[in-house]
C-alpha cells in the first residue's frame, strides 16, 4: 500500500510540475482572461444591470468568473495531459508502471484540482482590485470549488482517454 501511495504521489508531483513549468500559459493566461471578462462586462453593463441593492454588478460577476476559471482549468489540465501523452507516445510509460487504477486516477484528478484551484485563487486575488464580494458561507465555497474541480477533472480525464 505504501508503494502505491508513493507512486501516486510521484505521478501527482509530475503532473503538477508539468503545468507549473509553463505557468504563464496555464495560470497567468486564464487569470488575465477572467480579468478581461470582468473589465469588459463589468464596465459595459455596470450602469445598465441592477442585481441587488447592496451588491454592484462587478461584485456579482466575481464569484462566477472564479468558478468558471476553476472548472475550465480543471477540465483542461486532465484532458490536455492525457491527449499530449497519447500524441507523444509517453502514455504507455505511465500505464506500464505498477500503479493501481485508483492511484493513477487520483494523481491525474488531483493535479487538475490543484491547477483549477490555483487559477481560481489567482482570479479572486486579482479581481479584489475591482470589486469586494461578500461571502455568506465561505466553507461551502471551498467545498463546491473542490467538488466542482474534481468532477470536471474526471470528465476531462474521460474526454482525454476517449479522444
Where are these regions (language model features)?
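Hydrophobic transmembrane alpha-helices and immediately adjacent juxtamembrane helices
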Residues: 1-163
Amino acid at each position: 500500500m505504501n508503494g502505491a501511495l508513493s507512486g501516486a504521489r510521484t505521478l501527482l508531483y509530475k503532473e503538477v510540475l508539468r503545468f507549473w513549468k509553463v505557468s504563464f500559459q496555464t495560470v497567468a493566461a486564464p487569470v488575465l482572461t477572467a480579468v478581461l471578462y470582468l473589465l469588459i462586462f463589468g464596465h459595459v453593463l455596470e450602469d445598465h444591470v441592477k442585481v441587488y441593492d447592496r451588491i454592484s454588478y462587478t461584485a456579482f460577476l466575481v464569484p462566477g468568473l472564479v468558478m468558471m476559471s476553476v472548472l475550465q482549468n480543471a477540465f483542461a489540465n486532465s484532458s490536455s495531459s492525457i491527449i499530449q501523452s497519447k500524441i507523444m507516445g509517453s502514455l504507455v510509460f505511465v500505464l506500464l508502471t505498477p500503479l493501481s487504477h485508483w492511484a493513477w486516477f487520483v494523481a491525474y484528478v488531483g493535479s487538475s484540482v490543484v491547477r483549477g484551484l490555483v487559477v481560481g485563487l489567482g482570479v479572486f486575488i486579482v479581481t479584489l482590485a475591482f470589486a469586494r464580494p461578500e461571502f455568506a458561507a465561505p466553507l461551502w465555497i471551498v467545498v463546491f470549488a473542490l467538488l466542482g474541480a474534481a468532477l470536471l477533472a474526471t470528465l476531462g480525464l474521460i474526454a482525454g482517454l476517449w479522444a
